[in-house]
């Protein structure tokens, strides 16, 4: 495989979303085999103690790699048998023979445009046909996809999101972990190339000491709950992803499904943003599962959909920081 092609594939994979933009992945390349490994130094032990969000992010990276490979004229075969080992990994085998259609359904181009857009939306409804395209893109074995457009069904979900915010922002450990990953000024962004930028969080550019003060004193559980409720009510819909399996294989499958939906939404100029709070608090997640009559499925990703202007893009670390040499 030519170097420029490999670089484009790895860049596409590394543009996947991740909790707090931790970018918790490493890539090992041997010939036409790419191994995707978790980076344990980038775990979120407070908000994601079982690592389900980490593995969802790796699933998103895999899906980006598959989409990019197809666009570059390669067929990508995903081998998830490595997830059964003591140190789980994913492997993607590449061989010539993909479509070579660099923008077939627009997904390849959408990789660099996709973003979590955390601003208020304009309230416009998403056409039924476009919602159908999102549902079609979500199909993945073991993954459930649920759309909510009726205000009567959305309002109860808002209450869970509000309560999730109140519980999380009342937890000093949660707040400390969040602050650790906020980049409060351009200097921090340039130096670290990861985390949640001050612009994405709706904060001014300030020194870290002042940012910590703002987050600790001025951002309250109540204000966060109210802000989340306003954001959802400005949106056209909510979408929920569930997994039948509470293990890396199930979480990776959910990540692949979500990333296809996110890329498809991007081609339709539909924005999305995470509202995961009730999925991140175990007691609320169980209440949500019972309320929605999900059976044994686990609700893990809740997002809002709608239309809005884009926000500044989140940074990414350079490839030399995420590509490891040789076998693991």
Describe the residue ranges of each PLM region.
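Acidic, surface-exposed loops and disordered segments
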Residues: 1-328
